[in-house]
Amino acid sequence: AITVHLVDGDGCTITVAPKGFGSENMSRIQMLKPADGVEGFKKFVIETVKLAGSNPCPPIVLGVGVGGSFDKVAYLAKKALLRPLDVPNPDPYYADLEKELLTAINELGIGPQGFGGRTTCLGLAIEQMPTHVAGLPVAVNVSCHVTRRASAAL
């Protein structure tokens, strides 16, 4: 997919993020109810990893989107995979949620290649946007341990 963002200036930045489909097949989207709240959100993210098991070649990297609409939340999850692992969400609430989910996922014990252990997920990034009061869209984009990206400015 090609996504274009128009910004001020006279330059262009191109980012490429090749991704295997084994991990893509483990990605999920869910239109939660607002009453599900943050607990429902966390449950869905953790359940996604649990259901994936060894299929996405863990340790994995997760991009999580929340908010927007059906199409936007999937975009947010994919966009989250572009954020470097050592850069938390700028919103302290979501940064704390990233840490909490990473800990919970690593406590699942799936481990590298599904052989067990404490390193199931190398990193997790959440991207969010406002949504309609009647919905709580959530998407989890799963990527394997060789998550990679490259950017060039022209």
Where are these regions (language model features)?
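Non-transmembrane, aqueous-exposed alpha-helical and coiled segments at domain scale
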Residues: 1, 5-64, 69-154
